[in-house]
Amino acid sequence: MSDKTKTNEGFSRRSFIGSAAVVTAGVAGLGAIDAASATQKTNRASTVKGGFDYDVVVVGGGFAGATAARECGLQGYRTLLLEARSRLGGRTFTSRFAGQEIEFGGAWVHWLQPHVWAEMQRYGLGVVEDPLTNLDKTLIMYNDGSVESISPDEFGKNIRIAFEKLCHDAWEVFPRPHEPMFTERARELDKSSVLDRIKTLGLSRLQQAQINSYMALYAGETTDKFGLPGVLKLFACGGWNYDAFMDTETHYRIQGGTIGLINAMLTDSGAEVRMSVPVTAVEQVNGGVKIKTDDDEIITAGVVVMTVPLNTYKHIGFTPALSKGKQRFIKEGQLSKGAKLYVHVKQNLGRVFAFADEQQPLNWVQTHDYSDELGTILSITIARKETIDVNDRDAVTREVQKMFPGVEVLGTAAYDWTADPFSLGAWAAYGVGQLSRLKDLQAAEGRILFAGAETSNGWHANIDGAVESGLRAGREVKQLLS
């Protein structure tokens, strides 16, 4: 292997691959579910045209990559999938903590998310429900650090008011949510931030703190940087209905974890899968593509499908240079700087939920599991990693005890997606002015195709968007290689 490295915030891309301490820093009692079972050693018989090593190379082993590889494999193309990490899943990550299956990344699915739901039906995968109904206790933490306990009914009534006011024109702006720029109004609103609209809504202190918390989570950033149309589009994808939308976002997870669906898709694909293989360069040559890995291996293919997160493009050399539109996206990046945290406390707190306003760290807190014997496992989503060191157990304990005084923290498990050099950010989120330029991000460039949740038309912040983009890439491969 070469000694060349590329760095992000002090982390070596090469050292990250072999360092579980970096991948799961700050984790107590964590055991990653074996993703290697999806690795294929054989490929469906095919005749590689043009003297290339493969018909198709897919870069990235998340849901977009697994979907694209499956589509290409089933079309008879000899397909190789390269994943930089030592695991599959991309920005999903099934693991275990305190005896429970957990998800560090994308998790929730729903029948209103058509692409991922169809895949679950295809492979016979059911759902498990999170305990987010019939809540026992709800809290809000304001930006000044004060905490207010509110009845679940009052809490729910106020977030509904705030959210419906925020998205009041979603039907008008996105009558066809899977065609994002169908209306001129969508393009016009792309000049506005979520904060611009929140300021006009006349919300109460509670409602403003609730919607700030929620929108900071979607952004993985402060709401002044978060483009308004992206939120309206997601709401439209959920049927322009608050109850339906909330059900898509917080209720159902894939039985057996996200890795179960990844494994099923890749097993079906017949693709060859290699992990711990970062790609450093992609060059279009002689009617095909030459891919260079970080140990200087050269792999050739008729087509390459890039499914890695947008924020990592800057670590890959493209020849010829990518279009100006893509270069602008690469320079801007996508917003989200979020992290995921699980906390095991000794006390049985029951079914709890809490928001914390955007300047506070623990923006979304909910019960993952609870019992008198177990205590409580809290699932916590952090909008901006800079608000807390998720690997500092003392800091985490202090914040949890502000919300739930007197609890004893038994363990924590964390994943900082921005510190992961193969993500450099969390879930997809568009800044002001980005959604209207989505076509630039989606467009194929010669023999290089682009997928990933950021490039999807519909549920861009969800697993469904990644699957959608992988299906599109599969169609585009067929058009190029037919």
Swiss-Prot record:
Amino-acid positions noted as binding FAD in the UniProt annotation, renumbered to this chain: 64, 83-85, 91, 108, 279, 453, 462-463
Free-text activity regulation comment from the record: The catalytic rate is not significantly affected by pH.
Record's subcellular location: Periplasm
Keyword Isomerase part of the UniProt annotation: no
Summary of temperature dependence: Optimum temperature is 70 degrees Celsius.
SUPFAM superfamilies listed in its UniProt record: FAD/NAD(P)-binding domain (SSF51905)
Binding-site residues, (S)-nicotine: 381
Main location: periplasm
Cofactor: FAD
GO BP annotations listed: alkaloid metabolic process; nicotine catabolic process
Consequence the record notes for mutating residue 462 to W: Loss of activity
Consequence recorded when altering residue 427 to Y: 2.8-fold increase in activity. 7.5-fold increase in activity. Unstable, loses activity
Family of the protein in this entry: Belongs to the flavin monoamine oxidase family.
Function: Involved in nicotine degradation. Catalyzes the conversion of nicotine to N-methylmyosmine. N-methylmyosmine undergoes spontaneous hydrolysis to form pseudooxynicotine (PN). S-nicotine is the optimal substrate. Has lower activity with some nicotine analogs, but shows no activity towards neurotransmitters, including serotonin, dopamine, and norepinephrine, nicotine metabolites and common neuroactive drugs. The enzyme is stereospecific with poor activity with (R)-nicotine as the substrate. The c-type cytochrome protein CycN is the physiological electron acceptor.
Full protein name: Nicotine dehydrogenase
Organism (species): Pseudomonas putida (strain DSM 28022 / S16)
